UniProtKB/Swiss-Prot annotation:
Pathway: Lipid metabolism; polyunsaturated fatty acid biosynthesis. Involved in the biosynthesis of highly unsaturated fatty acids (HUFA) from the essential polyunsaturated fatty acids (PUFA) linoleic acid (LA) (18:2n-6) and alpha-linolenic acid (ALA) (18:3n-3) precursors, acting as a fatty acyl-coenzyme A (CoA) desaturase that introduces a cis double bond at carbon 6 of the fatty acyl chain. Catalyzes the first and rate limiting step in this pathway which is the desaturation of LA (18:2n-6) and ALA (18:3n-3) into gamma-linoleate (GLA) (18:3n-6) and stearidonate (18:4n-3), respectively. This is Acyl-CoA 6-desaturase. It catalyses: (9Z,12Z)-octadecadienoyl-CoA + 2 Fe(II)-[cytochrome b5] + O2 + 2 H(+) = (6Z,9Z,12Z)-octadecatrienoyl-CoA + 2 Fe(III)-[cytochrome b5] + 2 H2O; (9Z,12Z,15Z)-octadecatrienoyl-CoA + 2 Fe(II)-[cytochrome b5] + O2 + 2 H(+) = (6Z,9Z,12Z,15Z)-octadecatetraenoyl-CoA + 2 Fe(III)-[cytochrome b5] + 2 H2O; (9Z,12Z,15Z,18Z,21Z)-tetracosapentaenoyl-CoA + 2 Fe(II)-[cytochrome b5] + O2 + 2 H(+) = (6Z,9Z,12Z,15Z,18Z,21Z)-tetracosahexaenoyl-CoA + 2 Fe(III)-[cytochrome b5] + 2 H2O; (11E)-octadecenoyl-CoA + 2 Fe(II)-[cytochrome b5] + O2 + 2 H(+) = (6Z,11E)-octadecadienoyl-CoA + 2 Fe(III)-[cytochrome b5] + 2 H2O. The keyword ATP-binding does not apply. The protein sequence includes a number of characteristic features of microsomal fatty acid desaturases including the three histidine boxes HXXXH, HXXHH, and QXXHH (these domains may contain the active site and/or be involved in metal ion binding), and the N-terminal cytochrome b5 domain containing the heme-binding motif, HPGG, similar to that of other fatty acid desaturases. PROSITE patterns: CYTOCHROME_B5_2. The keyword Membrane applies. Residues 152-157, 286-305 are lumenal. Induction: Inhibited by a shortage of insulin and an increase of glucagon. It comes from Rattus norvegicus.
Amino acid sequence: MGKGGNQGEGSTELQAPMPTFRWEEIQKHNLRTDRWLVIDRKVYNVTKWSQRHPGGHRVIGHYSGEDATDAFRAFHLDLDFVGKFLKPLLIGELAPEEPSLDRGKSSQITEDFRALKKTAEDMNLFKTNHLFFFLLLSHIIVMESIAWFILSYFGNGWIPTVITAFVLATSQAQAGWLQHDYGHLSVYKKSIWNHIVHKFVIGHLKGASANWWNHRHFQHHAKPNIFHKDPDIKSLHVFVLGEWQPLEYGKKKLKYLPYNHQHEYFFLIGPPLLIPMYFQYQIIMTMIRRRDWVDLAWAISYYARFFYTYIPFYGILGALVFLNFIRFLESHWFVWVTQMNHIVMEIDLDHYRDWFSSQLAATCNVEQSFFNDWFSGHLNFQIEHHLFPTMPRHNLHKIAPLVKSLCAKHGIEYQEKPLLRALLDIVSSLKKSGELWLDAYLHK
């Protein structure tokens, strides 16, 4: 009988071979209307599904045409569950002769990093100490209570008002670090519980939006300090950052502001205004524009609670001024802490590095101490946090020595500095970029 002789009733039909692709072809599919990415050598067409991605379409788009294996593993807790959403998107796999990684990604560094992550799992460093996070939440609520007590007992004079504002700004800053933990799914094993508590902390305790934060912050983690991909370095022409941007602006004779003085006007419009003006407006408009009624309801619950508590002391207008004074104080704290780890590092176009190398190029650490840990929400361990975003922050210091060893092995710089030095480097970095702009503006 011929080849079809054994294909009859009850026989198993041979499965068609999976299409194979070369990196040269995959890299062409990096447009908003045409997105492919690779995970564990499997090729997925995520063009349409990216619009339904819970983390937003942009974070997927940033990896279009690339291997996204380590980013995929870093951001998701239950890989088997999220893997179910990938199955319908599978269109093929890498050709056998193709390397698993594309472009400038190092296979040896990647292999060592994955071994390091396995070591961290074996050390139970992804296991949460729930008492730690309970105490963090408790001390935030205690500060809220102390603030009300001060005004109730001492009245609304200038001194009690200023003290209360500092207490509430501290509470807001700490709530900001805490929502960051839940937003990164680093507290509970189940994503759903992290999402629920995240909405409570960022919404009811801070008046912000969980979805706005997710869509923005995960882009930053996926492509830190990469122009056109990391929203945290989108400075709206107010600052020029790194080396590439000031040179581009200078050569094109772009002068929206006197950037050679940006290290001076930073003190006037950076720390004071980011939260009370830019973030507060952007968050509210984003929730309304996207019709995110759930997050809006959570935010309204914060404002309702705040004004219900403080209108009796200050009246409507006074309570509004009081709120923005608190935001003003918190904004200084937030800006200095978040910028000390990134703005001083490499800021450039995408070089398509492997996960480990890209995170080390864009992040640095601040020395550990009890105060530094508390003050920064453990973001003094920014390197480890960026490498392992779902690792509970109380374990970051435990993996740090192993990260240092891996850096030393591959000749990658591991930067760690004192807190004051880290803060001063922000200003010196802005000054350096401003000088680069001025030189290019005048002479190129």
